[in-house]
Amino acid sequence: MKNFHVVLEAAWLVRDVKTADDAIGVAISEAGKRLNPKLDFVEVDVGTTSCPVCGEPFSSVFIAANTALVGLIFEMKVFDAESAEHAERIAKSVIGKSLRDVPLTVVEVTEFERSVEKGEQQQKGKANK
């Protein structure tokens, strides 16, 4: 079994905002309320979009008529998945249950090695003695 870091993207609608910073704050707050405290292992951040002209990255926020569309990024680690596709399905299922009616798109899936925690090292050291 392998471990994966899965990054998902969602479009979050925020009403009655005047600035991009307000929209970002409200979107992250609303998403966080839906995810926490059950899913405190999911990281929430604002996505970035590249400018089509100059290529510079900027926050994924679009405002029109005091309504904003904010691109949010959700990151989580999936342990003991059979494959990258399996990790994608697990992440979409876990996050999707809390964020009903919010479409999720997979941005990136990377495999990682599970590091041994200090407590586990001490336990192993005691077991070997």
UniProtKB/Swiss-Prot annotation:
InterPro entries: UPF0212. Pfam families: DUF555. NCBIfam families: PRK03922.1. PANTHER family: UPF0212 PROTEIN MJ0068, UPF0212 PROTEIN TK1194. Belongs to the UPF0212 family. This is UPF0212 protein MM_2357. It comes from Methanosarcina mazei (strain ATCC BAA-159 / DSM 3647 / Goe1 / Go1 / JCM 11833 / OCM 88) (Methanosarcina frisia).
